[in-house]
Design a protein with these regions (language model features):
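Bacterial N-terminal signal peptides that target proteins for export
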Residues: 1-11
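Bacterial N-terminal signal peptides
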Residues: 10-18
C-alpha cells in the first residue's frame, strides 16, 4: 500500500524549485567570513562569554575550531566557515539560526538557544556585521 503522505511530500520537493521562477542561490563569501565574522567568535565583550568558549570543540550545531596562539590556521577557518554556513540562510539574516539563537527572544531571537544571549538587539554591531555577510557583503 502506498503512503500518500510520502507521495505528496516528494511531489512538493520536486515542484518547489519551479514555483515562482528559478531561485538564485546567494553565495557566502569566505574572505569576508575570515576577516569580519570569524573574529566575532573569539572577541571578548564586557558582560558576555566568547562564543568559542562554549562552542569550541562542542558537540552541538555550532562546533567551532579554537584558534592557536597565532590565530586560526587556514584549515580551521575553512572548517569554521563550513560549520557556520550550515546555520545560515544566504540573503536571509532573519531566518538564520546563527543570528537568531543568540539574540534575545524579545527581539525576535529563538527561545531554543540554551546558551547565553550575545545580542540584546539586532542593532548590535556584531549582529549587523554577520547580517551584512549573510546578505552577501564581501
Amino acid at each position: 500500500m502506498m503512503n500518500w503522505r510520502r507521495v505528496i511530500l516528494a511531489a512538493a520537493v520536486v515542484a518547489a524549485p519551479c514555483v515562482g521562477g528559478p531561485a538564485v542561490a546567494q553565495e557566502l563569501d569566505y574572505g569576508a567570513f575570515k576577516a569580519s565574522v570569524q573574529p566575532i567568535f573569539i572577541t571578548k565583550r564586557e558582560g558576555y562569554t566568547r562564543c568559542v568558549v562554549c562552542h569550541g570543540g562542542a558537540n552541538n550545531a555550532l562546533r567551532l575550531e579554537r584558534p592557536g596562539p597565532d590565530g586560526f590556521t587556514e584549515e580551521q577557518s575553512k572548517k569554521n566557515f563550513e560549520t557556520v554556513s550550515r546555520l545560515v540562510v544566504p540573503g536571509k539574516p532573519n531566518e538564520s539560526h546563527l543570528l537568531l539563537y543568540p539574540l534575545v527572544p524579545q527581539e525576535g531571537g529563538s527561545a531554543y538557544h540554551s546558551g547565553g544571549r550575545q545580542w540584546p538587539t539586532k542593532q548590535d554591531p556584531n549582529w549587523q556585521t554577520i547580517a551584512r555577510w549573510i546578505n552577501g557583503q564581501k
